[in-house]
Swiss-Prot record:
Coiled-coil ranges from the UniProt annotation: 57-99
Tissue: Expressed in roots, stems and leaf blades.
Full protein name: Homeobox-leucine zipper protein HOX29
Gene giving rise to this polypeptide: HOX29
Lineage: Eukaryota, Viridiplantae, Streptophyta, Embryophyta, Tracheophyta
DNA-binding region: 2-65
Keywords: Coiled coil, DNA-binding, Homeobox, Nucleus, Transcription, Transcription regulation
């Protein structure tokens, strides 16, 4: 048969070819020949033609998949376009309403102004007093702001109280439905697009926050590839997707009309920080189907205003109020559902300290933590249902979500320390704000064993927690640094303690330092559909020499990192981890610990702060060659940082420790000290990171930003120059003298072309300061510099020279060393022409402060 001619295949031949195609879409020549031998029907078909058939078949399959993808994208774009048109119509109605209100108030104001001159002064004052106290809020009698007008109208026009009968509850439900729909699709609330959120085919949806209404409110609209009934089922199960939800109990269920239900719910929400109590809600939820087939679920709080059954207050919860809220779910023409979500609450901000009050007055926070969380969860589940999702370590997506939920819930439970969970507070020593709570009822080993078969024997859990205020530091950047540089804040013996905490005799671990870790390896496990959350396993290489077969050399932590987006308003960033056994089973007990950072003011506030910076923060802690210029490898990070340079955030830290009963006091003391060390390390890192956002480009601008500085930042460069002049009889920097200002000396030392390093006077000297050139030579930052020892910088010959010259430095105060080679923090060699060292003395009593080294004419090899 001529291979160049068209071939018409019989059904038997097509069946044989299709069978092989599904087994192997791209068979080799030998495999095609084998097919011809096995199928006599293909004997008269040229082998080249069979090859062409498979090529065409692969092309058709590729075209089919591409066509299906384009059709799905077209349906999505069509539905999104329809949603945007509806949103545009709603905005036009809102604009028309605002224009009408403005004109009406303008006419009323003009009429009042014409009447004012006719009044004597005393009569005008009396009339003004009457207007201020009048209860009539019509436009002819008083002109008020929209917000005040709404409040007065709300206070005046009160519905009559309803009883707890089915008819009374139905009346409340219908009123709730009307108010919810007016917010979801009408103009009852003035909605503003949330900063950082733009609608589009790849966006999560249309996100808006309220402006000028009572309480805090958020609205989200989006497309989800699931049927309305399944969407409603998921959204009604709030603990499934809202990680701050501690519990939600259905107290009573009543039928309501055709396929409708009324439910009475009691819901508890965890507090996000130690500085505020948790919230609870007593709710009525109404589920019904509208005339157009849309499914609606609306909720509101039951109180004395609406009537209905009451729920006694529960200590220590603060009773919040949910204003008419809910979900409107419509089937989409192209499949799936169009969802409108409204969350409108009054979180009683009066009940929290002023420093965290903005958290409870932030609509952006409600949008991020509730409205957008619901959309993200739905999109994640829909993505997993329609595609074959492959995750690490053989885990199904649902199992990984359960692990994330378990980490967050365990962290929230420890953070809140509620009595009905078994927690009690240990009396503080009064030195700081570290709170220690104990849960003796949390016996972890009741039904659990490790893979070795040994039972878990800890008899209680202790939690050390504290909150601190951060200023001028990006929460995602800070947590990213903590994630990637665990050695900067973690103590190796506590990491070993974490990993061994639930093993037999774990509390016999010595409290002295076990040794350093050789490093950490981050093993990705999974991330959500929108890459705002990562789940990973941290492998810590343990260099400990502790003689215990139960302490593995490799320690494992399950870690969750979320809130990585820097441009989104109200984003909460978290780094939560828990020690895991090598078996990593789904039912293993977890003791989550970690960090949570919540911004507490507007990211659009760009007022210039007046900060006091220490030496490390003054000279910054960014990457080499970017510390003063402000250049950052993160691309848009600098712009976002500049836009929020005066931002504030609350950081909450909580660490859990399993313990045996008789060791509670010693474990509590260890945990308190460990928490203090972590707070100190985090403050040091935060100050260093904040300075890299505050110093603008240009040396002149940098010099202007260096004032005021702390005494250490102001005096150390002066001491370096004075000591150099004393020992060598020459000026280290020709352009400065004893009369120069501290800022000019600091700037000159920072920009000196030679690498200047200072190290401590200890048995194992560590670096405490380096100028720009020194940090470049060592390829490190000021934060990481403090973990580098002097001996690691030199090669073998350099270490020998150092040992020879070190006594001279201590006795004579100075020494000169020949040229040699040093090694950077990443192992790169750098040669220097010569090096000098001198003892730096303080300016008061002449005591030795540190040793300075200067490497002249250095260059990388």
């Amino acid at each position: 048969m001529d291979a160049s001619k068209y071939v018409r295949y019989t059904p038997e031949q097509v069946e044989a070819l299709e069978r092989l195609y599904y087994e192997c879409p791209k068979p080799s020549s030998l495999r095609r020949q084998q097919l011809v031998r096995e199928c006599p029907a293909l004997a008269n078909v040229d082998p080249k033609q069979i090859k062409v058939w498979f090529q065409n078949r692969r092309c058709r399959e590729k075209q089919r998949k591409e066509s299906s993808r384009l059709q799905a994208l077209n349906r999505k774009l069509t539905a999104m376009n329809k949603l945007l048109m509806e949103e545009n119509d709603r905005l036009q109605k809102q604009v028309s309403q605002l224009v009408y209100d403005h004109g009406r108030h303008g006419v009323a104001a003009a009429g009042m102004m014409r009447r004012v001159p006719a009044f004597p002064p005393q009569a005008a004052a009396a009339a003004g007093h009457q207007l201020a106290t009048a209860t009539d809020t019509s436009c002819e009698s008083v002109v008020t702001s929209g917000h005040h007008h709404q409040q007065q109208q709300h206070n005046v026009v009160q519905p009559p109280p309803r009883d707890a009968s089915p008819a009374g509850l139905m009346s409340i439900a219908e009123e709730t439905l009307t108010e919810f729909l007016s917010k979801a699709t009408g103009t009852a609330v003035e909605w503003l697009q949330m900063p950082g959120m733009k609608p589009g085919p790849d966006s999560i949806g249309i996100i808006a926050i309220s402006h000028g209404c009572a309480g805090v409110a958020a609205r989200a609209c989006g497309l989800v590839g699931m049927e309305p009934a399944k969407v409603a089922e998921i959204l009604k199960d709030r603990p499934l997707w809202l990680r701050d939800c501690r519990s939600m109990d259905v107290v009573n269920v009543l039928p309501a009309g055709a396929n409708g239900t009324i439910e009475l719910l009691y819901m508890q929400l965890y507090a996000p920080t130690t500085l505020a109590p948790a919230r609870d809600f007593w709710l009525l939820r109404y589920t019904s189907i509208l005339d157009d087939g849309s499914l609606v679920v609306c909720e509101r709080s039951l109180s004395s205003k609406q009537g209905g059954p009451s729920m006694p207050l529960v200590q220590p919860f603060i009773r919040g109020e949910m204003l008419p809220s809910g979900f409107l779910i419509r089937p989409s023409d192209g499949g799936g559902s169009v969802i409108h979500i409204v969350d409108h609450m009054d979180l009683e901000p009066w009940s929290v300290p002023e420093v965290v009050r903005p958290l409870y007055e932030s609509s952006a926070m409600v949008a991020q933590k509730i409205s957008m969380a619901a959309l993200r969860y739905l999109r994640q589940v829909a993505h997993e249902d329609t595609r074959s999702v492959i995750t690490g370590w053989g885990r199904q997506p649902a199992a990984l979500r359960a692990l994330s939920q378990k980490l967050t819930r365990g962290f929230n439970e420890a953070l809140n320390g509620l009595a009905d969970d078994g927690w009690s507070v240990i009396e503080s020593d009064g030195v700081d704000d570290v709170c220690i709570s104990v849960n003796s009822s949390k016996v972890i080993g009741c039904n659990a064993t490790f893979s070795s078969g040994l039972p878990i024997v800890s008899t209680g859990v202790l939690c050390a927690k504290a909150s601190m205020l951060l200023q001028d530091v990006s929460p995602p950047s800070l947590l990213q640094f903590l994630r990637e540089h665990r050695s900067q804040w973690a103590d190796s013996n506590l990491d070993a303690f974490f990993a061994s905490a639930m093993k037999p005799n774990f509390c016999n671990l010595p409290m002295s330092r076990l040794g350093g870790f050789s490093g950490q390896v981050i093993l990705p496990l999974a991330h959500t559909f929108e890459p705002e959350e990562f789940l990973e396993v941290i492998k810590l290489g343990n260099a400990s020499n502790y003689q215990d077969t139960l302490v593995h050399r490799d320690l494992f932590l399950l870690q969750m990192y979320n809130g990585v987006e820097e441009s989104s308003a109200g984003t909460c960033s978290e780094l939560i981890f828990a020690p895991i056994d090598a078996s990593f089973s789904d039912d293993s007990p977890l003791l989550p610990s970690g960090f949570r950072i919540i911004p507490i003011d507007s990211p659009l506030d760009t007022s210039s702060p007046n900060c006091t910076l220490d030496l490390a923060s003054t000279l910054e802690a960014a990457t080499p060659r970017s510390r003063i210029s402000g250049v950052n490898g993160g691309g848009g990070t600098c712009a976002a940082a500049a836009a929020s340079s005066s931002s504030k955030a609350v950081m909450t830290i909580a660490f859990q420790f399993a313990f045996d009963g008789h060791l509670q006091d010693s474990v509590a003391a260890m945990a308190r000290q460990y928490m203090r060390n972590i707070i100190s390390s985090v403050q040091r890192i935060a100050v260093a990171l904040s300075s890299s956002r505050l110093v603008p480009p240009g040396a002149a601008a940098a010099a202007a930003q260096l004032s005021p500085v702390t005494p250490e930042a102001a005096t150390l460069p002066r001491w370096i120059c004075q000591s150099y002049r004393f020992h060598f009889g020459a000026e280290l920097i020709k352009s400065v003298d004893a009369n120069s200002s501290n800022e000019s000396i600091l700037k000159a030392v920072w920009h000196h072309p030679s690498a200047i390093l200072c190290c401590s006077l200890k048995a194992m000297p560590v670096f405490t300061f380096a100028n720009q050139s020194g940090l470049d030579m060592l390829e490190t930052t000021l934060v990481a510099l403090q973990d580098m020892t002097l001996e690691k910088v030199f090669d073998d010959q350099g270490r020998k020279n150092l040992c020879t010259e070190l006594p001279n430095i201590m006795e004579q105060g100075m020494a000169c060393m020949e040229g040699g080679v040093c090694v950077s923090s990443v192992g790169r060699a750098a040669s220097y022409e010569k090096a000098v060292a001198w003892k730096v003395v303080d300016g008061d009593g002449g005591g030795a402060h540190c040793i300075s080294f200067m490497f002249i004419n250095w260059t990388f090899l």
